[in-house]
Amino acid sequence: MALQTPSFLLPAAVVVLMVLSSPGTEGRDSPRDFVYQFKGLCYYTNGTQRIRDVIRYIYNQEEYLRYDSDVGEYRALTELGRPSAEYFNKQYLEQTRAELDTVCRHNYEGSEVRTSLRRLEQPNVAISLSRTEALNHHNLLVCSVTDFYPAQIKVRWFRNGQEETAGVVSTQLIRNGDWTFQILVMLEMTPQRGEVYICHVDHPSLESPVTVEWRAQSESAQSKMLSGIGGFVLGVIFLGLGLFIRHKRQKGPRGPPPAGLLQ
C-alpha cells in the first residue's frame, strides 16, 4: 500500500504563478528568488477516532492560503491567497474534503507508516504525600503518572468517591528521552481520618482506567500497621530457619556408630 499525497499540487503552483505574473505585480519590487512551499498535515487523536487535515500554502515564508478540515473550505490569509481560495473552493473543494480519508486515513493504516504512530505505552501510576505530617494538617498528594505514550491523558482526583476539582495543580507534560511522557498532578488537601483519595487515570493504551488509592490514617495506625508487617516478616524468617534446622537434623546419621569408633 503506497503513501498518498494530495493530487492538486501542480494546479496550486500554476495559480500562484498566474497571480505573480499578472500585470498588477509587474511594477512592484519583488525578490530575485521565489520560494513556494506546500505543507500537508494530518493530525490523529486516539488512532483514527478523530482526524484533522490541514493544508498550508506558503510563499517566501508567508502563509497566504490554508485549508482546515475543521473549517471545511479554503481561507485566504493574505491578498495573494484570494484568487487561489476562490479557485480551489470552486474546483477542488470536494476532492480536498475526501482526502481526509484518501490521504490521511489511508496513510495511517498503510503498511509504510512507522509503528511509532500506533505505539501504545501504558502509564505507571503512584501516589505520594509531600509531607509526612499528622491528620488535620494541610498537605499535598502527588499522583505521578510516568512512561506513557501517546501524550493524550486525563488524570483526576477523587475524595470519598467525589471528584475533586478545587486545589488540583498539574505540571506540563514532560518528555522522556524514549518519546514517552510523564506528568505530576497534585491535590491540596487536609486529610481526615478514614478518608479515601483516588488518582484516576484515563489513557488510550488502557482498556479501562487505572485507579490508585491512598487512605488517610493516624501516625499510630501507620506505626501499628508497620509493626504488624515487621512482626509477620520476622515470624516467616524464624519459621523458615526452624524448618531448615529440623530438615538438616533429619538428614543426620541414624543408629549406633560403627564398632571401631567405640574402642
From Swiss-Prot:
One BP annotation, GO: antigen processing and presentation of peptide antigen
GO CC field: cell surface; early endosome; external side of plasma membrane; Golgi apparatus; late endosome membrane; lysosomal membrane; membrane; MHC class II protein complex
Segments of this protein annotated with the region Beta-2: 121-214
Region (Beta-1): 28-120
InterPro entries, per the entry: Ig-like_dom (IPR007110), Ig-like_dom_sf (IPR036179), Ig-like_fold (IPR013783), Ig/MHC_CS (IPR003006), Ig_C1-set (IPR003597), MHC/Immunoglobulin (IPR050160), MHC_I/II-like_Ag-recog (IPR011162), MHC_II_a/b_N (IPR014745)
Signal sequence interval, chain numbering: 1-27
Pfam families: C1-set (PF07654), MHC_II_beta (PF00969)
Stored SUPFAM superfamilies: Immunoglobulin, MHC antigen-recognition domain
Covalent link (Glycyl lysine isopeptide (Lys-Gly) (interchain with G-Cter in ubiquitin)) residue numbers: 251
Compartment annotation: Membrane
Keyword vocabulary terms for this entry: Adaptive immunity, Disulfide bond, Glycoprotein, Immunity, Isopeptide bond, Membrane, MHC II, Signal, Transmembrane, Transmembrane helix, Ubl conjugation
Top-level taxon of the source organism: Eukaryota
Membrane-spanning parts: 225-245
Extracellular-side positions: 28-224
Chain segments carrying region Connecting peptide: 215-224
Chief place where the protein resides: membrane
Domain called Ig-like C1-type: residue spans: 123-211
GO molecular function: MHC class II protein complex binding; peptide antigen binding; protein-containing complex binding
Cystine crosslinks: 42-104, 143-199
Function according to Swiss-Prot or TrEMBL: Involved in the presentation of foreign antigens to the immune system.
UniProt family annotation: Belongs to the MHC class II family.
Protein name (database record): Rano class II histocompatibility antigen, B-1 beta chain
Organism of origin: Rattus norvegicus (Rat)
Gene name tied to this protein: RT1-Bb
